[in-house]
Amino acid sequence: PVPPDPAWTELPDDGYVRRDGAVIAWRSPSSTSATTPFRLAGAHTDSPCLRVKPSPDGSAVGWKQLAVEVYGGILNNTWLDRDLGIAGRVVGADGAVALLNVAEPVARVPQLAVHLDRDVNSGGLTLDTQQHLTPVWGVGASTPGEFTSWVRGAAEMSSDPAWWELCLYDTQGAAVIGADHSLLASGRLDNQLSCWAATTALAAAEPVDHIAVAVLNDHEEVGSSSNTGAAGPFLEAVLSRIVAARGGGVEELARALAGSSCVSADNAHAVHPNYPERHEPGHRPIVNAGPAIKVNSNQRYATSGDTAAVFQRACEAAGVPWQVFVSRNNMPCGSTIGPITATRLGIATVDVGVPQLSMHSARELCGVDDPGHLAAALGAFLTE
């Protein structure tokens, strides 16, 4: 790790710097200068979820409840009737940070029985996120500070925590499924899968004439506008300091960025067998057929003809297939850190992603081969 506070006068060839939920790591060739360009593999660390509010203790008709806030665009119904653990950061009064992961089931959002909602299967399920997504975590009446005391014990802290950033998550582990073992089911595939691929690729990269970088931003699911998000200064600051550590200034940074390129990796929508009409007929990614290059003429994705060709060459060098994703004209598409990175730094960027089903569900689905396909393609991009 490279500490962020001291001057970066003797920067290691390989290093990383972390800021809260974001990480930037790099590998350098044996010989570099202040104008050596960068090749970046970007992803985001966050996923849609339920986050515990600062004062969560609540009770209703004999049940202990936790007040939670919806983070990002969750699929509401997928959080019902799941055994939920709690994980995140806990901050002490002295500023010390503890990481907490309670992997055993602690809470559950119970669905209303069909006997009490006779029209649910014909009229559809409607959930009020304030009223109907509140989990229970015990029986009886909650007392003020009860959750705080529980966190103190779970995190093995000597005093009550001053603050926390805690998420609920499905405790069911990842599983390879299908009679042919061709599918991978897990929570948070969007976008932990791409984070794994980027870091795996960086660890294996052997750059020759550029600096290989993995940038894992936070807060993409809520717009990226934070000091650790893609719209914030974190990446620009790190790249600027790498250039400065090699004796460069504003001019050298501009030259380094002008020769740089970025692959923004964030999962794509695989064609859904039950809803094929929701997909563009000529651009329907399938699982286990390689990463999809994402294209949007309205710049919701940063892909251009040049950058698409760069990623295609990386796939060919790695021996992995690739495909193309385009949204329907009558169905707006999402966006990624790609356009934000391209806008902030002027770096030529391509958006790609592993095809998956059930995006933003508490439990998602992709092909077992595609994580490896993406890691191999990113490895070739960071090395070639």
Feature locations, PLM:
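N-terminal hydrophobic/helix-forming segments and targeting peptides
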Residues: P1-E384
